[in-house]
Amino acid sequence: MVQPHDHKSASPQDTVTSVSIQLLLFVDDRPSSQENIEQIQEHLERLKSEYPYDLQVIEIQQQPHLVEYFRLVATPALVKIVPEPRQTLAGSNIVDQLNKWWPRWQCAIKEAQDAQKVHNETNNQGDGDSPLNSVGYSAELIRLSDELFRLKKEKEELAEQIKFKDQVLAMLAHDLRSPLTAASIAVETLELANNQPDSPRIVQLKEQLYQQTRKQFRIMNRLITDILQASKSINAQLQLQHTHLYLQPLCLEILKQMGDQFQEKSLKIEKDIPQDLPPVYADEELIRQVIVNLLDNAIKYTPEEGTITVSILHRTTQKVQVSICDTGPGIPEEKQDRIFEGHFRLKRDEGKEGYGLGLSLCRKIIRAHYGQIWVDSTINQGSCFHFTLPVFR
């Protein structure tokens, strides 16, 4: 990697003793850039004999805030910060551009030196250090400005998180009340039924009450799970544990585990999952979470005796596509993009448990795997959710 020239240390505390041409050379670590960078530095070294200057070489990986501040779009790039106005040279012909602009910069710096001399004589000052003209000082000022902007942004994000959590707690308290009340009534009725002599009617009533109680507890569990998942996605970046993952056994395992939920609504499950699928490069637990969430939604919106289809396609050598389809009410076309937003709910969801936070988390997980997730849906015909994952190589 190219190191800073001896003309100027990279320390922000360094200052220069007079007004001089001051340059920032932005470089990267690409091998293809090294020859161009060396040519620029060699040419600057030759120019030094004509006129002194101060140069700081900046590696963009170490100081990205400077890249953003100077709005650089390519490297290498040479930025002249003194004399003003600031000027950026970029592209493959920086040496030619230097030859064009160097005489003009010399004239401008001589004018600045004359003005500085008059100012010093007027104010009875010597040629002391001029930190305002220091490359290091300018870089430090930019860094502090960038840090202030970052802290303001973090403050705004934290305020949004606190606001969201307050909203979620209020929603949770409100939505938990209904299933909790229903479960309490069912338990109290069971207590009364246990004091009655057994009869076919009492046995049937108990079974119905048990089912009702289990259903209400599942609703409460779903509400709490939604909140926990959303909290994780907001408070921390996803920690992916990539491995070569075989989707066929994972999908079959999940379908088996959710069998009781399918049977409860007499749903028909259709599978099109080839055995010769290549492994994907993914985090098993996070992908399991995505599949379970999409199947949960399919169960919730598919009417009794409806059909849910799970299929996996390997259309290219680079990715695998998973699709989960239902025969539910469908999603309006104008709403299909918004359902992946964290707090968006369709009108059909107003009577459903959950907050619709699951699809937002699914999108975050799939994007973290460099995949895509989307929905195809037709009103009154059903919806198909698709996502892709990269093939393991």
From Swiss-Prot:
Pfam families the record matches: HATPase_c, HisKA, KaiB
Highest taxon of source: Bacteria
GO biological process, one term: circadian rhythm
Domain Histidine kinase: 171-393
Keyword terms of this UniProt record: ATP-binding, Biological rhythms, Kinase, Nucleotide-binding, Phosphoprotein, Transferase, Two-component regulatory system
E.C. code: 2.7.13.3
Catalytic activities: ATP + protein L-histidine = ADP + protein N-phospho-L-histidine
Molecular function via GO: ATP binding; phosphorelay sensor kinase activity
Post-translational modification Phosphohistidine, affected residues: H174
SUPFAM superfamilies noted in UniProt: ATPase domain of HSP90 chaperone/DNA topoisomerase II/histidine kinase, Homodimeric domain of signal transducing histidine kinase, Thioredoxin-like
CDD domains documented for this protein: HATPase, HisKA, KaiB_like
Function: Member of the two-component regulatory system SasA/RpaA involved in genome-wide circadian gene expression. One of several clock output pathways. Participates in the Kai clock protein complex, the main circadian regulator in cyanobacteria, via its interaction with KaiC. KaiC enhances the autophosphorylation activity of SasA, which then transfers its phosphate group to RpaA to activate it. In addition to its output function, recruits fold-shifted KaiB (KaiB(fs)) to KaiC to cooperatively form the KaiB(6):KaiC(6) complex (independent of SasA kinase activity).
HAMAP family on file: Kinase_SasA
Domain notes: The N-terminus interacts with KaiC, while the C-terminal histidine kinase domain autophosphorylates and is probably responsible for self-oligomerization. The N-terminal domain stimulates the C-terminus to autophosphorylate.
Subunit-structure text: Homooligomerizes. Interacts with KaiC. Participates in the KaiABC clock complex, whose core is composed of a KaiC homohexamer, 6 KaiB and up to 6 KaiA dimers. SasA and KaiB(fs) compete to bind to KaiC.
Protein name, as recorded: Adaptive-response sensory kinase SasA
Gene: sasA
